Amino acid sequence: MEAGHEVTVHAFDRLAEHPMSENHHGVRIMRYHLGKTPYGGTLRTYQGIRSFQRQVVRTLLHDPPALVYCHDADTLRVGVALQQQRSVPFVFDMHDLQHTWVRYQAPQSRLRAAVAGRMKRRMLNRAKHARVVVTSSGGISPTSRGFSEWLAHHGIESHVVENRPEPPFPSRPSTESVGWTVGFVGRVRDRKAIDLLIKTVDSIQPHERPTIRIAGDGVAAASVRRHLMERVEAGELEAEVTGAFAQAELPDLLAEIDVMFAMYSPLRGNILQGALPVKMFDAAAYGVPSVVNQGCLMAEVALAEGIGCPAEWNDLTSVAKALFQARSMSVRLETTADRERRRWRKALLPVLDSLQ
């Protein structure tokens, strides 16, 4: 928009709960209601996404835009279709390795491995047609690589633009409180991560245990809520669980916690391949340290910027130690969305100039 272009967002409203057409600060949002479609890696999810892709392609072929911006791999089909049929260039913004989700529930499954492999090959083949590729992480040392290095390994050049919050950030209120709270704020998709948090809290001496605070929706949200409420009713731990929240509510949620739990099961391949959890940056922006996975890029970033502590996955002693260590930290996020905006403009400038 800053370059004088009109922007329309084509969004899949999976639960059909928002207006189908809306204008948000000059950006037109078109939402597609195609029946309720669950999140996750189910057949219904795949069918819903395919239906969304076909609808968007039909819409854009009727009135082609000057540029298509593909937000993650499940929209690449749209970009390639417009390029092949109308010579419209597209940008690929990759902030996840979508194919890794297929194997998450059953990593030993040969069928899931075959499906994941096919998705990976298809994504890479389509990505090679993009005018520009933007991705959300890049290595900061030879030790742990990010998505940019993963793409380079497959012959695709990319520009790193991390997903960091927008300043200014309010000061964290200083309050006198009894006890402390560990939070998991965001999409609740990884039940294994929540189970690790619960087991770790169980392993801590009762008089030192933190309260658990969960906020967010996702495929595992309902089961997590049921399990935690059963534990609370049995008097075994203290916890509070709430569902989806608006971005405007995030500061108040972060003000409730002392440490952010940002660990994920390594069975999700993208953790070891360079994913950077947005919740780690969001928490640091409000003065909250995070506990993250050891032995990968997120640990290097957390240590380099002084915004968190790494812990070994499934090692209760290591996780508990990191929670206590993080609790005593004072953090401040120095690198924000300001830097990422400059990176994004530099990456997109050639393609935007070509549209003039």
Whereabouts are the PLM-identified features?
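A charged, aromatic-enriched C-terminal amphipathic alpha-helix characteristic of glycosyltransferases
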Residues: 168, 313-320, 327-356
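Nucleotide-sugar-dependent
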Residues: 192, 246-253, 260-281, 292-300
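Membrane-proximal helix-turn-helix segments that form the acceptor-binding/catalytic region
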Residues: 54-61, 77, 81-85, 98-99, ...
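N-terminal strand-loop element at the rim of the active site
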Residues: 3-47, 147-152, 160, 218-219
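Nucleotide-activated donor-binding/catalytic signature segment of Leloir-type glycosyltransferases, i.e.
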Residues: 224-254, 259
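Conserved donor-binding/catalytic core segment of Leloir-type glycosyltransferases
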Residues: 134, 165-167, 174-192, 197-202, ...
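Glycosyltransferase donor-sugar binding loop
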Residues: 185, 211-225
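Carbohydrate-associated surface elements
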Residues: 139, 164
